[in-house]
Design a protein with these regions (language model features):
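Residue-level structural signal for beta-strand termini and adjacent loop
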Residues: 57, 75, 121, 142-144
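Conserved beta-strand in the GNAT
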Residues: 70-73, 130, 139-140
């Protein structure tokens, strides 16, 4: 019977459900396609965001407010993108234990999810791929380490 709960490692799980490995997707941010980088920067600063990476001269800024990250990108893509960075925490600092983007790619493929774009190089290090959710929202898995 699946209606009974059993505590496991401080979490509640169904008693008879087979669990699978939870993917470690890394740092989450939303990458916003903006029309005017300076105006967008000024707007987000008014609501508490601060620049912590990127360069206006390169057409992008990464901004942070507490544990929330946003990227402002002018002229780089058409739609907003949900972005995950394996190997980074929410402060864009390297973490020791993470699922490599190549492993995540195989897990995603094994679930029957279509890969929209794939840019994998070598057996480790920076690489990326993207998928599209059922509503057409792009999701980028982008490893920098």
């Amino acid at each position: 019977m699946l209606s009974q709960w059993q505590p496991v490692k401080e979490k509640l799980v169904f008693k008879n459900v087979i669990t699978e490995k939870i993917m470690k997707l890394g740092c989450f941010s939303i990458s916003l396609a903006v029309k005017d980088l300076k105006k967008s920067k000024a707007f987000y600063e008014k609501i508490g965001f601060e620049v912590f990476a990127g360069e206006e001269s390169h057409g992008f800024l990464i901004m942070k407010h507490e544990d929330t990250n946003i990227g402002l990108f002018q002229g780089m893509f058409e739609k907003n993108i949900l972005t995950f960075n394996p190997g980074w925490n929410q402060n864009a600092e390297n973490v020791e234990s993470f699922d490599d983007v190549r492993e995540l790619l195989e897990q995603i493929k094994s679930k029957g999810i279509e890969i929209a774009e794939e840019s994998i190089s070598g057996e480790q290090g920076p690489s990326s791929f993207s998928i599209i959710d059922p509503d057409g929202n792009p999701i980028l898995i982008d490893q920098h380490v």
